[in-house]
């Protein structure tokens, strides 16, 4: 069965990401491993590392339950704050052959920090794997 590595945070659970995952499922059985990078934004002036990690874990669990309820086979983990490092770290542990590709879900160009960092292209260059880039809208967690 094909597996896809999905990296998302603010767009995790968006209709656009769900559609991209379903498109892969339409091509045959597959499963998804979600990686939610720790995100240092949001309400509040300061966040501790444990608060950031807990927020990412909560966001991950809500998305995992939602995707599973919609019939998708999903596992997941919290990753490094950098989406590139988060993907590379998972591939170091599991191996590149464990995944058919990477789905990167970002905010729209006008507001995406990940796109300013060229994250989808950097993930492709660093991994040599096919990358599907999805532009989604933020989901309130």
Feature map (PLM): residue ranges:
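Acidic/glycine-enriched edge-of-secondary-structure segments
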Residues: 2-9, 62-81
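Structural motif
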Residues: 3, 100-103
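Glycine- and acidic-residue-enriched helix-capping/strand-helix junction motifs
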Residues: 47-57
């Amino acid at each position: 069965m094909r597996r896809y590595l999905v990296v998302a945070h603010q767009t995790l659970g968006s209709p656009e990401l769900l559609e991209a995952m379903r498109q892969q499922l339409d091509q045959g059985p597959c499963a998804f491993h979600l990686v939610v990078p720790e995100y240092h934004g949001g309400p509040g002036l300061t966040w501790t590392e444990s608060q950031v990690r807990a927020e990412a874990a909560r966001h991950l669990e809500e998305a995992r339950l939602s995707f599973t309820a919609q019939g998708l086979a999903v596992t997941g983990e919290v990753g490094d704050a950098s989406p590139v490092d988060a993907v590379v770290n998972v591939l170091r542990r599991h191996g590149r052959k464990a995944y058919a590709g990477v789905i990167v879900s970002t905010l729209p160009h006008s507001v995406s920090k990940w796109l300013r960092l060229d994250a989808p292209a950097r993930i492709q260059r660093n991994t040599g794997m096919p990358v599907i880039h999805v532009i989604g809208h933020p989901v309130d967690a």
